[in-house]
């Protein structure tokens, strides 16, 4: 019954279920271990403590493996950026671009905030996968010309150095990029701009709708969907 809705949403069971759901939606598959799952632990923290849902993406948090190695701790950290600066997320989505640009990370940020969906094209052995190669007609649409130009977005993200356990990241060196009509210099300004968009609010409500109904929303349900968007803009919390 409707009278029990508030109590159910405040329960530990809801926080657990929604954290698991959102973790499955925002990741490409299961993590290697419970100590490598920052999205799940941050989502549970956000819902449990009734924090603004935007904190999931831009909040000042550090999510690191706990001492036992069987989970992760969420602590406030002014240098944090939701889960996007957690080492495990950065390594997982660092990609393999030759110069260290996080093309995979750029796509994941766009997908998780706005719902962007792309169909990857599979190259052939010997194809030029460098910056110059990506400017070929078959590639430049996604990488340079569209509003979600992956190379442009990646230029404001940290750059990967090395591979595997020795992987590190350095600050971007390309300078500000023109993205979404703004001069964007780093990952924080990028994600903040995305979270301040209608596309972000719509995508978060798409996730809510799928969690509640087990399917995507459709056009005839627009009035209910719009109420979700308005509530997220006003109340801020899930």
What is the meaning of each model-derived region?
Residues 4-152, 209-213, 217-219, 224-238:
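Extended surface/linker regions that mediate inter-domain or inter-protein docking
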Residues 1:
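Mature N-terminal segment immediately following signal peptide/propeptide cleavage
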Residues 125-207, 225:
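Primarily the internal scaffold of c-type cytochrome electron-transfer domains
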